[in-house]
Every structure is written in structure tokens, then in C-alpha cells.
Amino acid sequence: QGYSSAASDVYKRQLMDLKLMPLYAILDPELTVGLPPRTTATTGMDALTHAIEAYISWTYNTKESLRLAEEAVKLIFDNLELAYQHGEDLKVRENMMIAAFKAGFAFSRAGVGNVHAIAHTLGGLYNTPHGLANAVILPIVLEDYGEAVYPKLARLCEIAGVKTDGTDAEKAQAFIAEIYAMNERMGIPKGFDFIKEEDIPQIITWALAEANPNYPVPVVYNAARCRKVIDTIRAKAAENLPAEA
């Protein structure tokens, strides 16, 4: 899959064809040693978004895609912050590449969801880096989904080692809280203040058209619910630390 956005067109389009699927993937951690910490953090959270959105997919999962998503989440929780702090560590770089590969395999089968649908609009309209957009939007959308995703998020919470006791709701909420905490520790903002009020109707139109029926989302958004999420993304910008961009 690839993406294209012409200079005169702010809509981010997906290009998908079997001919674009690689026969081999070369995972060489030495190629990522020079990746800046900021980009390491946001691309790692992008991989986490791939894994989680694939895992909570409503219909398209297989046993293999579920397993790969679980393994990706575990690897990312164990290695991303280490890669952010110690970019020269080839082992954690290798683990993150494996995690990204597994998450990519999972979402190629099971799809993504509303996080990506909204993130793509921000990339097209404001040139927001894709990983940064996903990192900020992911916990907000997961909170909005609520009980619809508690059982699966509770399972991921256990796998990630965040919390192993309590109810599904408690574990799911702890998992989401840890995503927020990971973002904060890596200097990723809580929200975006650049989303213009006049752009919101277009954002909603594009996001809804992409997510439904293309993605097997656990919660199908209407315009009002999508607007609520976008309002939250904007409101949370007030909580950003001074160093956050």
C-alpha cells in the first residue's frame, strides 16, 4: 500500500494493489541507528496503532493476525522507549523492526480503523506526520470506544505487562492510560491546536468515508461522534507540555 497527495490536492489517498506487496522484507537494525529520537517515538507509536487497530478489528482477524498483533504490542511496550532513549542499541532497534513487521502483517489482514481515518485527514490538510497523528489520536479513540473494546484491550494490557488483575474495564483503562504515559515520556503531545474549525466538516466527511465501509471498526462513527473525537483532540492541546510541538 502507498500514499499520494498532489500539491493541489490535500486529500491523502491510498494506493493498494497486490503488485505492491513485497516478496521479502529486509529488517536491518543498523539502518535505523541514526533515526532521531522524535521520529523513533512517533513511528513506533504508528506501529502500535497498526497492531491495536488490527487486534480490535470487528470481523477480519485470523488466529495468525491476532497472534502477530499481540506479539507486536508486547515488543513495542518492551522496546520502544529503550529505542527512544538509546538509539544506538541494535537489539532494541531490531526488536522494534520485528514489531513493526508483525503489526504490518496483522493490519494487512485485519485492517485499521477510525484512528487512521482521522489521522489521514490531518496528514493531507496540515502535513501532520502520520506517526505523530496516530500517536495522539490512538488513546483518544480507544477511550471513546469504551466498553466495545474493553475485552480485547484487557487482553493486550495483560500481554504488555501493564496490569494483570482487575476487571476488563479496569485493565482496558490502565492500558489506555499507559499509552498516554508513553507518549508523554517521549515528548509526544496530548492534542493538536492547529485543527481549524472551518476544516472540521471536511475532516469528518473524509474520515467517515474512509472508515466505513472500508475498515472493520469496532464502533461505526456518525458525524456527531466523529466531531466529538475531533473536539477532544483539539481540547487536549491545552494539556501539552511547553516542549511539546
Q: Predicted regions: what is each one?
A:
Residues 1-7, 11:
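Single conserved hydrophobic/aromatic residue that forms the stacking wall/gate
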Residues 9-110, 218:
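Carboxylate- and glycine-rich phosphate/diphosphate-binding segment that chelates Mg2+/Mn2+
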Residues 47-54, 67, 71-82, 95-98, ...:
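Alpha-helical scaffold segments in soluble metabolic enzymes
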Residues 55-61, 110-112, 144-151, 237-241:
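Short helix-capping/linker segments at secondary-structure and domain boundaries
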Residues 110-174, 180:
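C-terminal catalytic subdomain
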Residues 153, 163-245:
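C-terminal charged capping/lid subdomain of soluble metabolic enzymes
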